[in-house]
Amino acid sequence: MNPRWKSERRRDIYHRLATEKGYRSRAAFKLLHIQRKYGIIRAGDRVLDLGAAPGGMAQVASHAAGRKGFVIALDKAAIKPFTEKNIAVLREDVLSPRVERLVLDLTGGNK
């Protein structure tokens, strides 16, 4: 990686906050902002996070959906396992014909 990029990343306030708060990426703060402003994810919701790696937004969605909610983190890149019990990881290309069946299987056939 470019040394300049690494240096800028270390100085980035959201990168530091993500590290301090245990989020996997600074992108978590984008969803946190949207969630605070619009409340798009409610307790018990099912969330499909496309292009989820490394998983910062999935973490936020997990907390917003709560224990009765469920998050599927989908990416063709590897995603480290989550400690949150309501997140399932699918390593798959979103364009794969298998994705619809895999998602339906994880949600018990409910959309």
In which residue ranges do the predicted regions lie?
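Charge-rich alpha-helical segments
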Residues: 40, 50, 89-91
